[in-house]
């Protein structure tokens, strides 16, 4: 999420850009992989504060070398059908994209890949971030059913997305999270990390790690569940002061969870700076000689800011020097 840069003023108009793709689903069924890529990216936009019916998509496809193998050609065809089906049911178009059919190295092929990127605009006042905001909040999950062939019920999904937008605009939710690859478990953990606010699950919560795309977790601003009358939802639990996640008789500290979450890629993409133990020499820039007076008494500096297509920050640079 970012505000749109403007010259000589301020704006509340912001842009949202999200993505969706699950390689395991794409490998199992390119049709479902693409369909749920669109669903995931759209739900993420709505969870942030956007509206599903004003979203525009751009799709990135990546497949193995197809050659003259009809089975291989069926993979991108099925993926495009899945993406088109989701777009048609949601009433939103893809206005761009890029494809590559060279995802083969020797005997290794990429999984059938269609990544959906969703773009929308939103007033910054309506933007909601995913981290829990306070303790003793009720946390619910707004759920969308699956129909035959494991395709999401798009009519229910659109109804749920409209409800989330309404709740956000009425300031009735404090935080939101659109379910992704890791399901409820991932959502609650990441929502707890931000402000180190714990969570206690209610009894009987199942399918913690099922990627139920289309479901959205909401931290409610009040305990009034009548806001969700007529909708399919479950109460997951409540936020706590203890910095841990409790489910049944198990309690896991947020510190332990966060370290487990980060350690996989820490050697490749370090997030912690290395302490410098060597003594750093103090360098003195004070001149010992006589100060020289410039022949120019009035300085009028000029700043040259080169800009190129596809780059940004020129407005920020200009503002910094003004």
Model-derived regions, located:
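Intein/HINT protein-splicing elements and their conserved insertion hotspots or analogous self-processing inserts
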Residues: 1-11, 18-26, 71, 76-77, ...
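Short glycine-rich or small-residue beta-strand-to-loop segments that form or flank ligand, phosphate
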Residues: 17-18, 58-64, 302-307
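A glycine-rich phosphate/pyrophosphate-binding beta-strand-loop-alpha-helix module
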Residues: 31-99, 103
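Disordered, low-complexity tails and leader-like regions
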Residues: 66, 319-322
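Short hydrophobic/aromatic beta-strand micro-patches
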Residues: 217-221
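Short N-terminal binding/cap micro-motifs at the start of the first secondary-structure element
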Residues: 312-314
């Amino acid at each position: 999420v970012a505000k749109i840069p403007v010259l000589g003023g301020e704006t509340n108009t912001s842009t949202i850009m999200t993505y969706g793709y699950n390689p395991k689903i794409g490998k199992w069924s390119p049709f479902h992989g693409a369909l749920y890529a669109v669903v995931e990216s759209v739900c993420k936009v709505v969870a942030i504060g956007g509206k599903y019916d004003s979203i525009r998509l751009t799709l990135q496809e990546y497949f193995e070398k197809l050659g003259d193998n009809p089975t291989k050609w069926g993979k991108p065809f099925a993926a495009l059908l899945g993406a088109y089906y989701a777009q048609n049911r949601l009433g939103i178009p893809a206005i761009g994209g890029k494809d590559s059919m060279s995802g083969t190295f020797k005997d290794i092929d990429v999984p059938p890949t269609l990544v959906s990127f969703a773009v929308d605009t939103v007033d910054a006042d309506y933007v909601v971030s995913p981290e829990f905001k306070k303790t003793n909040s009720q946390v619910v999950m707004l759920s969308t059913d699956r129909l035959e062939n494991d395709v999401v019920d798009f009519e229910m999904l659109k109804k749920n997305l409209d409800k989330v937008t309404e709740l956000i605009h009425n300031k009735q939710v404090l935080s939101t999270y659109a379910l992704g690859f890791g399901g409820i478990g991932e959502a609650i953990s990441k929502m707890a990390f931000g402000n180190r606010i714990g969570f206690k699950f209610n009894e009987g919560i199942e399918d913690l790690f099922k990627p139920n795309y289309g479901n959205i977790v909401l931290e409610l601003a009040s305990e009034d569940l009548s806001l969700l009358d007529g909708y399919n939802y479950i109460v997951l639990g409540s936020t706590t002061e203890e910095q841990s996640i409790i489910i049944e008789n198990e309690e896991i500290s947020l510190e332990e969870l966060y370290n487990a979450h980060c350690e996989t890629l820490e050697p490749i993409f370090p997030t912690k700076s290395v302490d410098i133990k060597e003594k750093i020499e103090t360098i003195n820039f004070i001149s010992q000689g006589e100060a020289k007076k410039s022949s120019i008494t009035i300085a009028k500096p000029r700043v040259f800011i080169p800009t190129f297509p596809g780059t940004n920050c020129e407005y920020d640079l200009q503002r910094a020097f003004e």
